[in-house]
Structures are given as C-alpha cells and as structure tokens.
Amino acid sequence: MKRKVNFSVCITLSLFLLFLPVYGQQSGDQPCFKQRPALVFPGALRATMLGAAQAGQRIVAVGDHGVVLLSDDQGKTFRQAKAVPTRVTLNAVSFANDKEGWAVGHLGVVLHTVDGGETWGMQRDDLSSDRPLFTVWFRGNALGFAGGLWGLLLKTTNGGTSWEEVKLPVTQGRKKAEKNLFALFSNQKGDLFIAAERGTVFKSADGGQTWKEIATGIPATLWTGVALKSGTLIVAGLRGRIMRSEDGGEHWIEVNSGTKSSITGITELADGRILAVGLDGVSLQSSDDGRNFSVSSRPDRMALTAVVSSAQRDIPVIFSENGPVAVK
C-alpha cells in the first residue's frame, strides 16, 4: 500500500520531526514518487526553513516543499531561488565558497548549485528507499559528506558527482550502525564530527577515512553542533540538553541550559557570542565559551528551526516554522 506519511523515528523525536514530511512506501513496493520542480510562489517566504548557511555575503536557507530562500542584505529581506528540481523537504545546506553549494533532504536528495543558490541541479536521489539525509558538510569543492537516517553516511571526493556509503562503528551489542545522523561539523584542526542519536558524537581525525563513536554521557538525541574558534565543541538537542567538550570531543560535560525545550540550531557570532535556538520560541545565549547560557522565549512560542551568523554584522539570522524571523 502506497502512502504519504510524516517521518517519525521514535516518539521522542516527534515534536521536531513534525517539520520533516517525507514520502515513503512499504518494503517491496515500487517507487510511487516522481521528482517535480519546486513551485515559485509568494507563500514561500512563510515556509518552514530547516537549514541555513553563508555563501560569501549571501545567506541561503532551505526547507519545506523544496523551498530555497536567498538574502543579499544579511537577512533583512529574502527572495526565492529561481529553479529547484524537487519539492521534497530540504533539511540542510553547505557552501564551499560564495558560488558552489549543496543541499540535502528527503528521498536521499542531494542538490548542487554553482551560482550561489539561484539555480540548483539534482546530483542524487533514491526513490527506491526511504532514507532522508539530514546534514551535509563540504571542505572545499571536492570532499564532502552527507548523513541521515539509520546511520547512513555518504562520502564524495569529486564534488558530489558520485557518492559512496561510509561504514560507521557499530555500537556494542548492535549488529549494525543505525543511529540517525543529524549534524556534521568540523573544527579548525580539520577534525570532523557528527551529532547523532542517543547522545552520540562520531569523530574522524583523518578527513573522514575512519570514525569512532563517542558517548557524551546523556541519552538525548543531539540535533545540532558547533566548533568554536577557541576549539571548544558544543552539541545540543532534545529537551534542551547541551554538552560541551574542551579536548576535541574525547570527553564531555553537561551545561545547564535553563530550558526543557529542544534545541534545533546553534552558531558562533563574529563577536564570540554563542546563540542557540529551539522549539517553543526558545533562544539561548552564551558569552563565556559555552560555560553558561541565558535563556529567553518568544511570546508566540513559534518554533525556531535554524540560525546562522551574518557575514558583516554581529546579528544572527534566525529561521522558523513560518520562514525567516525579522532581523532587528
């Protein structure tokens, strides 16, 4: 039986994953979905945005229905990309420079742009299985990784022309790697990290050739992570849990976030402040390398889904279930 479903890995993820619709089919069915270009429509500015990145001076955000939004004035105004070859939800975006970038989403979609996000081409999709990609990271315009459902990690060494699956370590007592991968990021040394399910961080110190699994010490799923200029690592996620590491991810301590609302995005601003956003309209800010956070909430409790620092100002650009949040 063919059906359209809301993606839900487990009950603890249901709140956040309300924003991640996916088309699926039962095992054994033939693919029932054909790619169609994203519509260009006025309501795109109110679409749920799930990922954002800097592309030089431009900010590019991706989200529901294949919507890609662009801002050339540091988040004051946005417009829709001219051509996107899919209507599936896009979850994350990464740019190697001001022109070349990649976006990933449901149905294993990988999109590629060479004009700063104005137009996109399809590099990969997988209509035969229901394994969405949640995160993407590139170093330069050749080496890249994309991570997603049930431990799916893809690697490219040619800018996404071809992808191969990478085998992650298997958790003791498990038969295969199956933890969902939510956020790829790197530090200034070049180490790679993946914030993942059940309080897990994966680390590679050799450019992604080998990986090790590190338990942060909490059971909560980690949805986002950042490497600060100081070298400190911060990961965060379900029910407001925040973990911090000062030794390259080998050991972690928990930071009191002051909230039970799940954290969906985190970034470091140019002035060194750290800003995290989350469900229920929550924002958290730290000025001491992530040791302490102050918390505030929007009166309307609108879910905040992504945050990126602007290239020229110490003002974050925030996205939500209703599109970009006005910059003050």
Language model regions located:
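Bacterial N-terminal signal peptides that target proteins for export
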Residues: 2-11
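Bacterial N-terminal signal peptides
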Residues: 10-19
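Residue-level hotspots at or immediately adjacent to binding/recognition sites across diverse folds
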Residues: 23-328
